[in-house]
């Protein structure tokens, strides 16, 4: 079973935005979650550190990190987890939260037809996610 890990992160003690951590008191529940649950640690913005990686390692949870639409953030998150993930870091799960039709159109068009910056970036992040899934993190 997989669970999103954000509800087990103390949102008042991390550099993440309010959506990436619990600010309603659910974070202590991490002590009650069975250790055979795979946590999905999602962060979509660039940070200098990702303390949830350290937290999940310290608490003995296997976890994957999850990115979305910012290539620099995806790469920084992967680099951090690769350096700090000791025994429990299991890989990368790419998320996609909308805009699938324009993104797919971008991926099949030639470069002369690719105009919209946001769609281009979004598609490139998906391409990066697919590449990582195919060849691995190294």
Predicted regions and their residues:
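Substrate-binding groove of N-acetylhexosamine-processing glycoside hydrolases
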Residues: 1-138
């Amino acid at each position: 079973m997989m669970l999103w890990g954000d509800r087990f992160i103390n949102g008042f003690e991390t550099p993440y935005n309010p959506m990436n951590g619990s600010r309603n008191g659910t974070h202590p529940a991490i002590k009650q979650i069975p250790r055979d649950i795979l946590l999905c640690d999602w962060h979509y913005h660039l940070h200098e550190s990702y303390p949830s990686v350290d937290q999940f390692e310290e608490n003995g949870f296997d976890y994957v990190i999850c990115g979305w639409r910012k290539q620099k953030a995806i790469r920084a998150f992967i680099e951090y987890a690769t350096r700090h993930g000791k025994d429990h870091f299991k890989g990368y799960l790419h998320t996609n939260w909308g805009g699938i039709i324009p993104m797919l159109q971008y991926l099949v068009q030639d470069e002369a037809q690719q105009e919209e910056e946001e769609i281009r970036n979004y598609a490139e992040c998906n391409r990066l996610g697919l590449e990582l899934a195919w060849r691995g993190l190294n």
